[in-house]
Structure formats: structure tokens, C-alpha cells
Amino acid sequence: MQQAWFDVKFKEAAQLRVGKFKTPFSHAYLTTLGETLFPQLPTSLTTAVIMPYTLNAVTPNIGTGFDLGVELHGLVKDKFGYEIGLFNGTGAAVNTASKTMSDDWHIPSLLYAGRFTYMPYGVMPSTQGNPNRLNEKKMLIGVSGSINVESENESTNDTRVGFEWALLYHKWYFAAEAYWMNVGFTKRQKINEHYNYVGGYIQGGYFVAPRVQLAARYDIMNRNSTTKDGLLNMPAVGVNYFFKGCNLKLQAMYQYTGRTGHANQLDRDNDNLGLATHSATVQLQYAF
């Protein structure tokens, strides 16, 4: 089960959501699944980072995605939004509450997350391009953060911070995000070190015809942490066709995974393990 949740609306500024849903982190993730610019999310959000230890149970990525939890959220004056929640911290693959207490911090081993947004022109729709919204003028500026206590099978405490910006202006759509993750090991791992990872992307789309949208993205990440030289840079291009009279969309994209700045060939080879140098995706998607 990927998602199942309900909302209780006390008023516009105070709403309670309970179930399995998207955690409050990243414009890319929080966009409605059928409304994304590309069929694949930015690699810098979804790929597992690399550590200088062989720990099969420790494979975090910067994005937090879907999770079980409870969240208080609301909208103030149609301009200010907030989301504050507690989550299981185990991601989309787990459907039961499985966390206990932190041995190190003596607090519940949960994902503590929050997001705050400012939308100067009114509520930003959850879309990255829609042929029925070609006269919009909306902008979103947001900041989010989280601490996942005893994540990765009780092996690490992970801190994440993100900044996001998005703009819908008539036929144009633009977005940019930057994010940082700090991974610190729990005492039982006997590793007294912290590792920092940063990533980000910029992307844009334009409707060249009423139902045809062109897309471009540049994605970047230091997958092997700031302790080593080297970056992944991942440009992508795409095209979207929206069928008339239904919520059906045909998407196609191509992405290249490049590597630059590594100290040696071994680091360069390791940095894109599990990632295709050239990838193409075609997807027919129904939004509901």
C-alpha cells in the first residue's frame, strides 16, 4: 500500500491528516503524481547515498517520500502554509508502526518533519504543468526540515534541510530546489563520524502547443558525501502530451548521468553504481 489517509478539517488554518501519505519535504515529491514535469523524480532525491562502510542496512536517500504518520497542516490568509508531522520514518515499504525508543536520545524513534511555505499570489496548485491552467500566475517559496531518529534499522540519526522555489506563469513552469542531509551513526554502530550530502536541481517546462509541453532539468548531487571530491550531474529533457477530454498524459524523457571532479578512477566508478549512464523513460499516466 503506497498511500491511504484521511483529513479532518477544523478550519482552513488547522487540519489533521492521519494515515500513509507524503512527508512534508520537497516540491518534487509533493506535486500530485499525475502532474509532474518528468516521469522520473530527480535522481538526487531518490538514489541511495554512498558511505565508506559496508553496511547493508544503511542506504538512506535525501528524499523521505511516503510514510505512516500524523500531520497538522493548514493555510493562513491564502499565502502562508505549514505542515508539521510525526512519522514512522521507515518509508513507503512499511505499513505498520515499527519504531520504539531511541537508546541514545531517549525520545521516540520517529521522523520529526516540518515544512513552511509562502505563496504571494495565492495558493500554488499541486502541478508542474496543466493545459487547463495556462493563465496562472502563482509562486511558492518554501523551507523544510526533518530529523529521523534511529533510521536505517536503528543505525543512524539523519537530519535533512531543504529549500524550494516554484513558479507557474501562463505557459511557463520553473522550479529549483536545494537540499542537505547529515547522517550520524548511533552509538551501537561504534562509528563516531558524520557524513554530509547535498543535492539540488533546476527544471522548467513550456507549452509549445495547447497540449504539448517541453521539459528540461539539470540535477546535481555529491553522492559520496562532502568528504570526497566528485559530483554527479544529470541533465534531462522531455516532452509531455495531454489527451483531450480526460486526465491521461503521455510522457517521455531522456537523462544522462555524468561524473566530474573525482580524485581517482575508483571513486568515479563507484559514484554511479546502480545508475544508468543513459536512460530513457516513456510513461502513460492517468491523474485522479
Say what each PLM segment does.
Residues 5-8, 133-288:
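Outer-membrane beta-barrel pore domains
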Residues 112-125, 237-240, 283-285:
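Short, well-ordered amphipathic alpha-helices
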Residues 1-92, 108-123, 133-134, 198, ...:
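Outer membrane beta-barrel
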Residues 30, 83-85, 93-101, 126-128, ...:
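A short secondary-structure junction signal
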Residues 57-59, 99-103, 148:
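Active-site rim elements
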Residues 61, 105, 193:
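Glycine- and other small-residue-rich loops at beta-strand/loop junctions that grip anionic moieties
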Residues 64, 85, 104-108, 153-157, ...:
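Short, contiguous, pocket-lining structural segments
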